[in-house]
C-alpha cells in the first residue's frame, strides 16, 4: 500500500520504522529537520563543544517498554542519570531538593522549622493516600484540587510540592493542576514510582544526546522523508486519500496523522463530526524554551540544585502563569564543564540575554476532563476513511506515548490488511 505519514516526531518515525518494509511510505515534514521534540543542539562555549538536549531528554526502565524495545533493536544505548526535583519559592523564601536528606535540608534553618517537618509528613500522607485511591473507582469528573481539599492538605503542601511537581511534568500552570483529572494524575504518579520514597525507576539519557537514535531509526527509509513539505490539506474519498503539499496533489491508499491533534484537524478539509468533536477537545499549549548558562533561575543555594528545578513566585499571579521550570543539563547529561547549561521554560524575561544560547517554542498537550473523555473515543475515528491518528496526546504526553500510539496505528493497519503484528508491544505501565 501507499501510505502517507504526516509528521516526523517520534510517532511518525516509529510508524516509518515498522511500516517501511511492507509498504510504500512517504513521510511529510514541514520543518527542515526531523525528530520533533527530539532536539539536540550543538553549542560552543569557552572553546568547547557541547551537544545539549532541549526537548526529549529522559526515559526510564519501568514505563518506557516500547521505546526501549525499539532502541535495543537499533542498537542505541542509554546512560543512567539522576532524576531529582527542587522548588524555590521567592514568595516565602523556601528552597529544597528532595533527592537526599542533605539536599532536602539545603536550607539549614528548616532543621529547626516545625512547619517544614509537617510539610514532610504531608508528603508521606499524600503518597499513602494516593496509592490507595489510585486502585479505587474514582469519578471521571473529580479533580486533583478537590482531592486535596477533601483530605485537608495544607496550601503550603499543595503550593510547594504536589502542584509544582505536576505542573513540571505536564507544563501546566498551578491553577490548571488543581483542575487536573484526578484519576489520570494518580495512576501516572503510581506507575512512575512518584508515590514512593524508595523503589523508583532508573532514568536514562541517550548516549550522545537524544538525536543519536534518529539516524539508526530512519536508516531503512531516510530516502522516503520529504523535508520542507508542509501538508496544506488532506481530502478523502472511497478510493483513497489526496495529499496536497508544495503545490502538488498526490494520491495514497492510507494517511497517518503523526502530528499534533490540532494540526491534524486543520489539515482535514472534510473532517467528520466525530473527528471534529474528538480532536478539537485535545488542545496544545505553547511554552517558551531557552537554552542558556544563567544560573540565577536555579535555587540560590547550590546544594538545592536538582535535575528539575521549579521557580515559584507566590500570589495569584504565580498560580496562573505557565510553569517556570529549569532543567539542569549538567546533571542530566553528565556534562563536565565550568558552565552550567540550563533549559528553562517560560522565564525568558528573567534570563541574562548575554547568556542565551538558543530559543525555541515547544507545544505540549493540555490534559483536561474533556481531553481525557476524547481519548476514550479514539476507536470512533481510527482507520475510518483511510485515516489514522497517532501522537503522545492519546496517552500521557511523553515519548513512550508517542511510540505506543504509533504501534496502535501500525497494528490497526496490519489488522485491516491481514498482516502480522503481534510482536510489536512490550508490557509496561502506562
Predicted regions and their residues:
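N-terminal Rossmann-like FAD-binding beta1-loop-alpha1 element of flavoenzymes
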Residues: 2-27
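Conserved Rossmann-like nucleotide-cofactor binding loop
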Residues: 11, 33, 262
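Glycine-rich FAD pyrophosphate-binding loop
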Residues: 20-44
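N-terminal glycine-rich dinucleotide-binding loop that anchors FAD/FMN and/or NAD(P) in oxidoreductases
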Residues: 41-67
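Mobile amphipathic helical/loop "lid" adjacent to a hydrophobic cofactor/ligand pocket
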Residues: 61-182
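Conserved flavin/dinucleotide-binding core of flavoenzymes
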Residues: 99, 319-430
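Helical element adjacent to the flavin cofactor pocket in flavoenzyme catalytic cores
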Residues: 185-243
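Mid-domain catalytic core of redox enzymes
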Residues: 230-363
Amino acid at each position: 500500500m501507499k501510505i502517507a505519514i504526516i509528521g516526523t516526531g517520534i510517532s511518525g518515525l516509529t510508524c516509518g520504522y515498522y511500516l517501511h518494509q511492507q509498504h510504500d511510505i512517504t513521510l511529510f515534514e514541514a520543518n527542515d529537520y526531523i525528530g520533533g521534540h527530539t532536539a539536540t543542539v550543538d553549542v560552543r562555549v569557552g572553546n568547547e563543544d557541547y551537544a545539549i538536549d532541549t526537548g526529549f531528554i529522559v526515559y526510564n526502565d519501568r514505563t518506557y517498554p516500547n521505546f526501549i524495545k525499539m532502541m535495543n533493536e537499533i542498537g542505541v544505548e542509554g546512560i543512567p542519570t539522576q532524576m531529582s526535583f527542587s522548588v524555590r519559592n521567592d514568595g516565602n523564601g523556601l528552597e529544597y531538593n528532595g533527592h537526599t536528606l542533605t539536599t532536602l535540608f539545603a536550607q539549614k534553618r528548616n532543621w529547626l522549622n516545625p512547619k517544614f517537618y509537617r510539610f514532610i509528613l504531608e508528603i508521606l500522607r499524600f503518597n499513602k493516600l494516593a496509592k490507595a485511591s489510585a486502585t479505587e473507582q474514582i469519578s471521571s469528573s473529580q479533580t486533583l484540587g478537590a482531592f486535596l481539599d477533601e483530605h485537608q492538605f495544607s496550601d503550603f503542601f499543595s503550593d510547594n510540592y504536589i502542584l509544582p511537581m505536576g505542573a513540571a511534568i505536564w507544563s501546566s500552570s498551578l491553577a490548571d493542576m488543581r483542575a487536573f483529572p484526578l484519576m489520570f494524575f494518580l495512576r501516572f504518579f503510581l506507575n512512575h514510582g512518584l508515590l514512593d520514597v524508595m523503589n523508583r525507576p532508573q532514568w536514562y539519557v541517550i548516549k550522545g544526546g537524544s538525536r543519536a537514535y534518529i539516524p539508526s531509526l530512519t536508516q531503512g527509509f531516510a530516502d522516503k522523508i520529504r523535508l520542507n513539505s508542509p501538508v496544506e490539506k488532506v481530502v478523502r474519498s472511497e478510493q483513497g486519500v489526496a495529499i496536497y503539499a508544495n503545490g502538488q496533489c498526490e494520491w495514497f491508499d492510507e494517511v497517518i496523522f503523526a502530528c499534533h491533534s490540532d494540526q491534524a484537524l486543520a489539515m482535514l478539509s472534510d473532517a467528520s463530526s466525530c473527528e471534529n468533536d474528538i480532536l478539537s477537545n485535545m488542545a496544545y499549549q505553547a511554552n517558551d524554551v531557552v537554552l542558556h548558562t544563567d544560573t540565577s533561575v536555579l535555587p540560590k543555594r547550590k546544594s538545592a540544585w536538582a535535575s528539575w528545578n521549579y521557580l515559584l513566585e507566590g500570589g495569584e499571579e504565580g498560580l496562573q502563569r505557565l510553569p517556570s521550570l529549569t532543567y539542569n543539563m549538567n546533571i542530566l547529561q553528565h556534562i563536565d564543564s565550568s558552565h552550567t547549561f540550563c533549559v528553562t521554560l517560560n522565564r525568558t524575561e528573567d534570563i541574562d540575554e548575554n547568556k542565551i544560547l538558543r530559543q525555541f517554542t515547544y507545544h505540549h498537550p493540555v490534559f483536561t476532563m474533556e481531553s481525557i473523555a476524547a481519548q476514550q473515543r479514539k476507536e470512533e475515528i481510527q482507520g475510518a476513511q483511510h485515516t489514522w491518528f497517532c501522537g503522545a496526546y492519546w496517552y500521557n504526553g511523553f515519548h513512550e506515548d508517542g511510540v505506543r500510539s504509533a504501534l496502535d496505528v501500525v497494528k490497526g493497519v496490519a489488522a485491516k490488511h491481514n498482516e502480522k503484528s503481534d510482536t510489536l508491544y512490550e508490557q509496561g505501565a502506562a
